[in-house]
Structure formats: structure tokens, C-alpha cells
Amino acid sequence: MIDRDDLSKMPFHPSRRQMISGMASAAVLLGGGRAFGQARVQIDQGNVAPLPIAIPNFVAGSPSDSEVGAGVAKVITNNLKRSGLFAPIDQAAYIEKITNIDVPPQFANWKTINAQALVTGRMTRQGDGRLKAEFRLWDVATGQQLAGQQYFTSPEYWRRIAHIISDQIYERLTGEKGYFDSRVVFVDESGAAQHRIKRLALMDQDGANVRYLTRGADLVITPRFSPSTQEITYMEFGQGDPRVYLFNIETGQREIVGNFPGMSFSPRFAPDGQRIIMSLQQGGNSNLFVMDLRSKSTTRLTDTPAIDTSPSYSPDGGRICFESDRGGRPQIYVMGATGGAAQRISFGEGSYSTPVWSPRGDYIAFTKQGGGQFSIGIIKPDGSGERILTSGFHNEGPTFAPNGRVLMFFRDPGGNSGPSLYTIDVSGRNELKVPTPGFASDPAWSPLLS
């Protein structure tokens, strides 16, 4: 079933493919060796002291580009600060004004304000209307250029360039991939608690560029990205039984994923993007099924007198974690991707739900309920190393950043208020609220866009 009513008429941003075509086919390395200098964030060594970093406004090729140059620097600053690993220095403390990025900075001026790393950049309008963005990353102590690249893009995508540069800086100084050039799909909530309108919404990971994918006529929950980031699967309560839908972000078209009798819910893509795993209700039980999106064939993975739901694949697609009450209370189980025997991995007090596998493969995040608290935690796939990251009245729905270092979840204080999105590091530090236009729940973080 293809549904083109209204959705295809909505304004959509260009796809990732179209956005990248506006840039150079390959980023050009402007300098910098592979060796790390003294400016380095030791991300795996316990409590991390944030690295002092200076990020002046990017030099403008013309007066009309000065606002964009300042905007790029601000986005990079906010990204790095929110990661908890960097301490951007206030521009009011700067001694030197960068006017030409082709000339090495006066490093003594940056040492004086205790900067360990320095980012310089330039935004230049090209004859064809495109923007040329350049940046350099410097180790202040050694004077070594650590990275330098240039990009070409349409002017409206300057924020995207800022996220890509943020990822380059993050990776160069931590040794791990960044997560800033990514998006989040979530459920936007508005109206009184008794008559809440819920719409699918999409935004950059920092809360910018929000746009709505559905109009709120029907209740929607549990949106999830495809590996390509161009499709979303979600559950909608429309006429009749709730159904799982597949939504194309680029075209605005959607279709039902299988016309099954009864209720289908908790959908999630396989890592290959060719299959969707979900839970189907049959009588009083719910079992896991996987559907091939091309052939529409389905395979049953579990067959128990219980409720099996919330499945999530391991990054290599070889295993599945899911929630099941087959032992009484809801717990987390792990089994092979083709079904078979399942191993329970959660044994703490209370019940466990909404498991999701980290893109790194090292942890499974979950919601834990017990003692009047809803907690967000992580556990290793073998059941060891359980750790609670944050607790409160109602925390739920964890989702990993593309690099597996940060989690996003939603918190609902109850009453006349509504839910909000938060991020927290897998270490349990740096809990931050994510800005959204209104109430927000059920977040899902995309893979990196580039």
C-alpha cells in the first residue's frame, strides 16, 4: 500500500546524496601529518579533563560572508562543548585576530590564554554561487598542523559543513569517529496531556533544522532510521489495528510493512537495510518476525507463550537483542539473527525494556524500571558490566550516537508537563537537555550522513 496523500506535498530537504553532490567529490587535504601532537583527548582514561580549544570566527572572503563565518565557528564550538571532551575558550579572551589562515598563527598568543588546540578557517563565495569552506587544526604547544581540509557546498548547507568539520576535529583529537553530522527522528508532542498531538519530526543532532514528517492526524511512535538514513520505519495508530510503516524522507511517500492480521509494532531495520524486524501480536502473545523488503517474505524468529518485542540487531547483523516476559518480568535476551535458543542477559532488580545495540557492538542500552524509578543503563552483550547512567521518575527509549559514545533518551516528569530529550555519555557524565520546539519523545539517532 502506497500512501501519497499530503505527505508528498510537504517540503523536504535534499537527500544526503544531493547534499554531498553540492560539495567537492573529495575533501582536499591541506596539510597536517598523521602523528598526534600534544593536543590529545585520552577518551578511554577515566575522568577526562576537557581540552581547552580556541575557535575564532572563520575569516570571510567578503563582508557578506562574515555572518556565515561566525555561524560556522559557533556551531563547531557548541558541538565540541556539548561533547564534554572540549572546553572552548571565550572569544573575548583572544589576543590575536585571525585574518589570514594561510599564515601560521602566533602560537605564543594562544599559549597565553591556555589554548592547547586552535581551529582557523575561511568561508569564500565562489563565482558560481557556492561556498568554499576551509579549516586548519593546530597543536598550539608544538605548532604542528594536525588537519586541514576544504569543501564546496551550496550556501544553505553551511551548518552541514560545520558539523563535518566538527567531526574532523573530534576524530583528530580523540582518535575516534565523531557524531555531529547526523540527524535525529523523534515524536513531537503538543497540546494538553489528555489530547496530545504526536507528529514525526526530524532534526539535526543539535536540535537545529526541525521539520515535520507527519501532520498529527494519527498517533505515531517508535520511529527508526534505515542504515542509509533515507527511510524511517515507525508504528502508527490509524484506522483499525496499529501498523508498521516505511516512510521515505526524500519523497514523502510511505507504505505499510506487511498487511498482517493483528497488531504489528516495534520495527527496526537490519544493518543491511534490506529487512525489517518487528513484533507481531497473535492472540495474547507477541513474537518476532523479520520481513524482506524486496520479496515481502516473512520469517518467524520466536514462538513462545510470551510477549517478545523491541528487537535490535548487533552491528554485524549476526545477533538480536530483544525484550521478553517469558520468565515473568520483562528482561533482555540475546539470540542468533535467524532465531533459535535465546540467552537471558539481565538479572538485576526490576524489569528491563527497550534494548538497543551500540554501533560499536560493545554495549546494549536499556530502560530499567524498579523502585519507582526509570533508569537508562548499559550492559555488555554477555550480561556483564551492567551500569546505570541516569535515573528519575520516567526515563525511557535510549538510542546511540553513530560512534556509540553518547546516548539520547527522553524524560517525562509527568503531570501537565511533557517529555524532553536528553543526551548522556556512556560513562554516565555530561547529561544535557536537547533543544526542541516543544515536547519530544522516542528519539532515534541516525548513522553518520557522510
Swiss-Prot record:
Pfam families: PD40 (PF07676), TolB_N (PF04052). The keyword Signal applies. It is found in: Periplasm. Its main location: periplasm. One of its GO terms (cellular component) is periplasmic space. Residues 1-35 form the signal peptide. Gene3D superfamilies: TolB, C-terminal domain (2.120.10.30), TolB, N-terminal domain (3.40.50.10070). Keywords: Cell cycle, Cell division, Periplasm, Signal. The keyword Cell division applies. GO terms for biological process: cell division; protein import. Part of the Tol-Pal system, which plays a role in outer membrane invagination during cell division and is important for maintaining outer membrane integrity. Belongs to the TolB family. The Tol-Pal system is composed of five core proteins: the inner membrane proteins TolA, TolQ and TolR, the periplasmic protein TolB and the outer membrane protein Pal. They form a network linking the inner and outer membranes and the peptidoglycan layer. This is Tol-Pal system protein TolB. It comes from Nitrobacter hamburgensis (strain DSM 10229 / NCIMB 13809 / X14).
